[in-house]
């Protein structure tokens, strides 16, 4: 049976365009002009995923999102204008349970949606596979050991040929909150970190700024030539590849170029460059996400002597990228998200 998608948008043009795009991909599509109509339709037939606008009459999308997550959680993809203040709203939606974001321009919407059909279908299909209970488990703190219990030993890692120099992280669907959990746990003197998160280009700068406010380390959108330093995390700009080179230290390279593994930025591009440049001094981490971007790169990192970690199935919103890496033998460790940060700290000691 085809996955059932509910498109909630007050624009008839958007509803029609998304219905055609998703319908051609074999998805069953229902539409609603606003959240109140959507709630009535959801009482009759529960969708597998919702595509949601934010600015609508009678009830805004964020209020509707909160109600959905509180009453009967359904994977939600936000499809809204993200430029300027909209990017902050989109971040808020992700924090409140949305699994991904699709950019929607203010003008030329129909043509833009048609041009972005492949990404839209990919994101919505991934949402139908999202497991919201896994997101709850990922964000839940680890239970405290009972009084008198022996402390859990630190992970025993293989001897490292070089010093702990660089952490590289890749993520996609569900990754924005996973990255927040990971980076918030980093101390101010954490090793240099480079991140690729699949997201629209107008979104990454605001995402990095939000993380910077929450974390003890500095977090910024990467610019070409930025130094990768202890206590700093660089986030790949949307629609640009991020790699690393050595020039009196580790330096970020931000570049154009064709998509790799169907993505720009590509996790594989970052991981392959880290394997060449930093090798055994690298820790590679592959978090939740759809598809297989990063799986080959994580395997190359492991072959170069790096320590490698994949997020486990129980805490992955979409167990795609980590699953592929595990299947290829790329992961030295498979860990629930709350234990990934402790693995970083154990490796860096």
Curated annotation (Swiss-Prot):
Biological processes per GO annotation: chemotaxis
Gene3D superfamilies named in the record: 3.40.50.2300, Methylesterase CheB, C-terminal domain
Residue stretches making up the CheB-type methylesterase domain: 159-349
Gene Ontology molecular function terms on file: phosphorelay response regulator activity; protein-glutamate methylesterase activity; protein-glutamine glutaminase activity
Keyword Phosphoprotein: yes
SMART domains (UniProt xref): REC (SM00448)
Catalytic residues identified in the record: 172, 198, 293
Transmembrane feature ranges: none
Post-translational modification as stated in the protein's UniProt record: Phosphorylated by CheA. Phosphorylation of the N-terminal regulatory domain activates the methylesterase activity.
Family: Belongs to the CheB family.
Biological function: Involved in chemotaxis. Part of a chemotaxis signal transduction system that modulates chemotaxis in response to various stimuli. Catalyzes the demethylation of specific methylglutamate residues introduced into the chemoreceptors (methyl-accepting chemotaxis proteins or MCP) by CheR. Also mediates the irreversible deamidation of specific glutamine residues to glutamic acid.
Descriptive protein name: Protein-glutamate methylesterase/protein-glutamine glutaminase 1
Organism: Anaeromyxobacter dehalogenans (strain 2CP-C)
């Amino acid at each position: 049976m085809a996955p059932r998608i509910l498109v909630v948008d007050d624009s008839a043009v958007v509803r029609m365009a998304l219905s055609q795009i998703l319908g051609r991909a074999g998805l069953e599509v229902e539409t609603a002009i606003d959240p109140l109509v959507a709630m009535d339709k959801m009482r009759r037939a529960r969708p597998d995923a919702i595509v949601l606008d934010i600015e609508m009459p009678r009830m805004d999308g964020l209020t509707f999102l909160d109600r959905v997550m509180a009453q009967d959680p359904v994977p939600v993809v936000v499809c809204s204008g993200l430029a300027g203040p909209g990017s902050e709203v989109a971040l808020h939606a992700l924090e409140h349970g949305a699994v991904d974001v699709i950019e929607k321009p203010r003008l030329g919407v129909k043509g833009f949606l048609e041009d972005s059909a492949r990404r839209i279908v990919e994101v919505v299909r991934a949402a139908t596979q999202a497991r919201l209970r896994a997101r709850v488990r990922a964000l839940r703190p680890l239970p405290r050991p009972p009084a008198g219990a022996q402390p859990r030993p630190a992970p025993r890692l293989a001897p490292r040929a070089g010093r702990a120099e660089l952490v590289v992280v890749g993520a996609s669907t569900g990754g924005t909150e996973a990255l927040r959990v990971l980076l918030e746990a980093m101390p101010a003197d954490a090793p240099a970190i480079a991140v690729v998160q699949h997201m629209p280009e107008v979104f990454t700068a605001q995402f990095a700024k939000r993380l910077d406010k929450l974390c003890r380390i500095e977090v910024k959108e990467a610019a070409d030539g930025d130094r990768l330093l202890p206590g700093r995390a660089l986030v790949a700009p949307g629609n640009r590849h991020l790699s690393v080179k050595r020039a009196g230290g580790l330096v970020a390279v931000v570049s154009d170029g064709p998509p790799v593994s169907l993505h720009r930025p590509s996790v594989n591009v970052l991981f392959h460059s880290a394997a060449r440049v930093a090798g055994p001094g690298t820790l590679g981490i592959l978090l939740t996400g759809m598809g297989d971007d990063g799986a080959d790169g994580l395997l190359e990192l492991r072959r170069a002597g790096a320590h490698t970690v994949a997020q486990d199935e129980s805490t992955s919103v979409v167990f795609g990228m980590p699953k592929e890496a595990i299947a290829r033998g790329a992961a030295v460790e498979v860990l629930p998200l709350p234990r990934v940060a402790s693995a970083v700290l154990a490796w860096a000691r």
